[in-house]
Amino acid sequence: MPAASQYLRALEARGLLTCRRVGRRVNYGPTTGTSEGAAGEIVKALRVSFRKAQPIDAIFKLATAFTHPRRIDVYRNVAIGADSFAKLQMTTRIPARALSRHLGKLEARGLVKNEIARYVAATPRHPFARVLASLARR
């Protein structure tokens, strides 16, 4: 099975897409946004995001913020108060170079701020970023 089909099925299984068979083809589309839980929150935020200019670039950049499990762990620890680089390294057990790289990606996406040698969770302005940050904290 092609990778695209597998990804579409995975998104459907999580409630982000619906599929409909039309003859030999299967058409995928966004859900109505009425689903509950994380999928519903994500779909609603994406609908708002697509109304803005240049949505694809912004959504792609934000979606890649939490594509690595360690980055989610780093974000969670920053959100609960592990504010210094040393504290983050101790609580996450991530090597310094990798931790620095993960923090850089989170900073570039507006999810974490570095304020004079301490890290704090930022309040994202983008609706999709807010939903992702909320889900990462869970």
Question: Regions from the language model: what does each represent?
Answer:
Residues M1-E12, R93-A108:
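Short amphipathic alpha-helical interaction segments
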Residues E12-V22, E107-A117:
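A short, conserved structural fragment
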Residues A13, T32-G81, P127-R138:
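Amphipathic alpha-helical dimerization/coiled-coil segments
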Residues R21-N27, G33, E115-R125:
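Short, Lys/Arg-rich nucleic-acid/phosphate-binding segment
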Residues H68, A86, H102:
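Short, thiol/selenol-centered motifs that function as redox-active sites or metal-ligating centers
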Residues V74, F85-T92:
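A short acidic, leucine-rich amphipathic alpha-helix
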Residues E107, K113-N114, Y119, P124, ...:
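C-terminal regulatory/effector modules of DNA-binding transcriptional regulators
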